[in-house]
């Protein structure tokens, strides 16, 4: 990450680097309602392939945004959920979604 002088700005850039990609936003929006198994996430975000989804989930887990729990009731499955920190990011995600909808309605292009 590029070095910036102001530590507060550096922290902002760190948060944006975690949530600032298409599939990450899709994961956060999808997990907003409830925890999900990997296969449920794949079905909910069909354009994200398994490798990309796995990569983003690991990145989010490493950043403390998503928790990963392995369940072994009968067949083993992995459940993903937003952590309390991940839930704190939801207003940012919602704001990005609202701006995107406004731009779509007005046909404005971001410059």
Regions flagged by a language model, labelled:
Residues 7, 11, 29, 81-111:
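Amphipathic alpha-helical dimerization/coiled-coil segments
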Residues 69-71:
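Conserved catalytic-core motifs of GNAT/GCN5-like acyltransferases
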Residues 2, 6-52, 63, 73-81, ...:
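N-terminal helix-turn-helix DNA-binding core of bacterial DNA-binding proteins
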Residues 56:
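Residues within the DNA-recognition helix of helix-turn-helix
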Residues 59:
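Alpha-helical DNA-recognition elements
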């Amino acid at each position: 990450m590029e070095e910036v002088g102001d530590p507060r700005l550096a922290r902002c850039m760190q948060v944006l680097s975690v949530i600032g990609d298409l599939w990450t936003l899709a994961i956060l929006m999808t997990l907003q309602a409830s925890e999900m198994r990997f296969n449920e996430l794949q079905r909910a975000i069909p354009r994200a392939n398994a490798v990309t989804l796995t990569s983003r989930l690991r990145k989010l887990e490493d950043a403390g945004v998503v928790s990963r729990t392995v369940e072994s009731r009968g067949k083993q499955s992995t459940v993903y959920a937003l952590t309390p920190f991940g839930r704190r990011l939801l207003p940012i995600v919602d704001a990005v979604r609202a701006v995107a909808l406004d731009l779509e309605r007005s046909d404005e292009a971001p410059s």
